[in-house]
A protein has these predicted regions:
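Preference for long, well-ordered alpha-helical segments
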Residues: 105-141
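Short helix-adjacent coil turns
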Residues: 45-50, 99-106
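Short, solvent-exposed, charged loop/turn and helix-capping segments
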Residues: 65-83
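Acidic, low-complexity proline/glycine-rich segments
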Residues: 1-11
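A structural signal for well-ordered alpha-helices, especially hydrophobic packing surfaces
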Residues: 35, 39, 66, 70, ...
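Short, well-ordered alpha-helical segments
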Residues: 31, 78-91
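Alpha-helical segments in soluble extracytoplasmic regions
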Residues: 40-69
Length: 141
């Protein structure tokens, strides 16, 4: 119990002290965690009473995080890249909605792969630019 309280405090402080670029990375991590938990729940036996609830909760959480990433885009300053990212986040959300409605794992696996690629690219950009450029290009996250 105490350890989880420390973990919550650490996460809260991490968010408060993170650069905009690091916040985007945290959002990707959160989306991947939720998507992964939903994917694992799909593997649970159909008679598991919490299976459907877990899938639904985790997919909704992932959709909410992806919506935050999408809402953070500055379509004017970000130009074509921001527009492309906006459409990509929209696609991710539609696929997760489809997975949730039809209770199919395929779209979850697809979106997990796509979001992981975005997360890796973002992390690489942060590492290469030491976070400085990430602050300037937050509008296209």
């Amino acid at each position: 119990m105490v350890a989880s309280g420390y973990a919550r405090t650490y996460r809260a402080n991490s968010v408060l002290t993170a650069s905009p670029g690091q916040l985007v990375l945290m959002l990707y991590d959160g989306a991947l965690k939720a998507i992964g938990l939903a994917r694992v729940a799909f593997e649970n036996p159909p008679e598991d009473p919490r299976r459907i609830e877990t899938i639904n909760q985790q997919l909704l959480k992932a959709q909410s995080i992806l919506a935050e990433l999408q809402n953070g885009l500055n379509l004017e300053a970000g130009g074509e890249l921001a527009s492309t990212m906006h459409r990509l986040y929209d696609y991710h959300n539609r696929r997760l909605m489809e997975a949730n409605l039809r209770k199919q794992v395929g779209p979850v696996i697809e979106v997990e792969r796509l979001v992981r690629e975005l997360r890796e690219a973002w992390a690489q950009m942060l590492a290469q630019n030491d976070g400085n450029a990430a602050d300037r290009v937050r509008s296209v996250a």
